[in-house]
Amino acid sequence: MANPLYQKHIISINDLSRDDLNLVLATAAKLKANPQPELLKHKVIASCFFEASTRTRLSFETSMHRLGASVVGFSDSANTSLGKKGETLADTISVISTYVDAIVMRHPQEGAARLATEFSGQVPVLNAGDGSNQHPTQTLLDLFTIQETQGRLDNLHIAMVGDLKYGRTVHSLTQALAKFSGNRFYFIAPDALAMPQYILDMLDEKGMAWSLHGSIEEVMADVDILYMTRVQKERLDPSEYANVKAQFVLRASDLNGARENMKVLHPLPRIDEITTDVDKTPHAWYFQQAGNGIFARQALLALVLNSELSL
């Protein structure tokens, strides 16, 4: 059947409607249950990481290989013409797009992925993270995990903790969950790392309930999902980082009184914000969440690169 995501750029979670999200998640579930090792057999995909990454890059490249695609690219722009010779991003993308069927791209500069779409011709660009702006494929695996564990994506109580200012994952996830009905958000962060006002304004416009809190304890008994984030050292000056890094830490003892099916998620890497004793509790779900990245990214690649898809 024809699908609306064929050859579509995926730069922001706002590029996907609620129906699009449901299509990706349904496709991910099918691929998890029934692997398709030759679905992208004759496709070549560029994996272009201008910024360091472990999970996102390996998850994307594993997804490509498991669907049968060929993979080219780099994990460090320092050894490319852009890094060594001063080639522009526009020229880099213009050239790469002549070689491949799709470009997966991470870049430290906000807006870089959107800029790349202006020079990629008919080749779709998938944003694997652009600065502190957007991380749509992380959001897809987050949604897939929430749906798997809670059985729904509406009427949920979701707490987001830590670096809500620079954490692109929480920006994208909040925007995505706002497409569904009845969700309530609890934001727990230091004042210096509070959720951006444009996100709060968006929730107000959609009539979504939200509130600000000073501790995890305040909301523990009320939430279905506790979404932890690390304080991003690379985006703060050293003195600011030292002041806030340990302000919100989750320990196993903090989970007393949590709902039985409440799950703790984290986009990883974690530093000190979740102690290892949490790993042994039934609430810890961040490693399963990371594993779901394979299926969410496989689904997106399959849909973007196939005009018709029947699984």
Curated annotation (Swiss-Prot):
Quaternary context: Heterododecamer (2C3:3R2) of six catalytic PyrB chains organized as two trimers (C3), and six regulatory PyrI chains organized as three dimers (R2).
Entry keyword set: Pyrimidine biosynthesis, Transferase
Functional summary from the UniProt entry: Catalyzes the condensation of carbamoyl phosphate and aspartate to form carbamoyl aspartate and inorganic phosphate, the committed step in the de novo pyrimidine nucleotide biosynthesis pathway.
Binding site for carbamoyl phosphate: R55, T56, R106, H135, Q138, L268, P269
Any Gene Ontology CC annotation: cytoplasm
Organism of derivation: Salmonella typhimurium (strain LT2 / SGSC1412 / ATCC 700720)
UniProt GO MF annotations: amino acid binding; aspartate carbamoyltransferase activity
GO biological process: 'de novo' pyrimidine nucleobase biosynthetic process; 'de novo' UMP biosynthetic process; glutamine metabolic process
NCBIfam families: asp_carb_tr (TIGR00670), PRK00856.1 (NF002032)
Name used for this protein in its record: Aspartate carbamoyltransferase catalytic subunit
Annotated catalysed reactions: carbamoyl phosphate + L-aspartate = N-carbamoyl-L-aspartate + phosphate + H(+)
EC annotation from Swiss-Prot or TrEMBL: 2.1.3.2
Pathway: Pyrimidine metabolism; UMP biosynthesis via de novo pathway; (S)-dihydroorotate from bicarbonate: step 2/3
Binding site for L-aspartate: K85, R168, R230
SUPFAM superfamilies listed in its UniProt record: Aspartate/ornithine carbamoyltransferase
Protein family (similarity comment): Belongs to the aspartate/ornithine carbamoyltransferase superfamily. ATCase family.
